[in-house]
Amino acid sequence: MMKMEGIALKKRLSWISVCLLVLVSAAGMLFSTAAKTETSSHKAHTEAQVINTFDGVADYLQTYHKLPDNYITKSEAQALGWVASKGNLADVAPGKSIGGDIFSNREGKLPGKSGRTWREADINYTSGFRNSDRILYSSDWLIYKTTDHYQTFTKIR
């Protein structure tokens, strides 16, 4: 009798082990798939998020105090193979725009203040050669635009 109870107990334990193994495997696949889906969904959203209009970039600067992720500096672009005279930014850095470099304000057309620095970013760039639209933002978050390549400036924030 004890021998039969031992065999029955072994069968139950084996069955429970198999059920646990199946359950753990299913849970692992479920969480793995969910994580991959969330990661790829976030990646696609981030890659698709190109902000390059005057209002879009100005709003982003005011909110986050940095340029959107689709901006790279001239040196970062050059490291990827960008040559300004070739107009090849879209080829070497798809979806990216030039921005974040220092603007010297040599002519003094933008408001000056001790310790204030200005940076610039391309606006409305899609491909080919860069256009004349730029946004200028200061270290104390003044924001100006130019549509005539630094000839005139308009405060937008």
Curated annotation (Swiss-Prot):
Signal peptide feature range: 1-34
Keyword field: Endonuclease, Genetically modified food, Hydrolase, Nuclease, Secreted, Signal
Claim: Glycoprotein is one of the keywords in the record: no
Principal location class: secreted
UniProt entry tagged with the keyword Lipoprotein: no
Gene Ontology, cellular component aspect: extracellular region
Taxonomic superkingdom: Bacteria
Record-annotated active site: E120 (proton acceptor), H149 (proton donor)
SUPFAM superfamilies: Microbial ribonucleases
MF term (GO), any: RNA endonuclease activity
Effect ascribed to mutating H149Q: Loss of activity
InterPro entries with a match to the protein in the record: Barnase, N1-like, Ribonuclease/ribotoxin, RNase_N1/T1-like_sf
Biotechnological and industrial applications of this entry: Introduced by genetic manipulation and expressed in male sterile maize and rape by Plant Genetic Systems and in radicchio rosso by Bejo Zaden. Barnase expressed in transgenic plants will specifically destroy the tissue(s) where it is expressed. After cell transformation, protein expression and plant regeneration, the active nuclease destroys the pollen producing organs thus rendering the plant sterile.
Function, in words: Hydrolyzes phosphodiester bonds in RNA, poly- and oligoribonucleotides resulting in 3'-nucleoside monophosphates via 2',3'-cyclophosphate intermediates.
Protein name: Ribonuclease
